[in-house]
Amino acid sequence: MRIKYEVSAGGLVLRRNGAQLEALLIGRGQPRVWSLPKGHVENRETHEQAALREVREETGCWAEILSKLSDISYWFYLNRTKHKKSVHFYLMRYLSGDTANHDHEVDEAAWFEIRAAKKNLKYVNEKRLIDLGLEYLQAEGTGLFETETVALVTEALQDISAS
């Protein structure tokens, strides 16, 4: 059997919206399957460049990378070929843009309060990225977002670990 190897990159994009910390998700299909924005690394692109490009294309939003989060690998079958896909995920901060400007590859891009984002994500490995992102923000302190955000992160971590 043939095996095809694929490399993708994507991001967990966060923003503060009033008293909430929000994550940017993409939705496909009906009913919606929610996931993090990601896509193939193109020729001569770094993983970071691909992650930023895919976030911009799939969500209509610009972001900046704060940190590498994790690599996720999984297997799937397509057209009688076995695929191994590795995805490099980054923690990102929202800069600008409008989710209405997402591209045709997704049906919807939307902001979710961080706990709702974790609940709505389809894939367990992506749910874990929410935890990793919150843990990173808590450890790094307030320099990445406004001061009040650390309290939101701590509260979200407590709620998520209790559920």
Where are these regions (language model features)?
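Residue-level marker of positions within ordered structural domains that often coincide
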Residues: R16, L95, E135
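Unchanged
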Residues: V41-R128, D159-A162
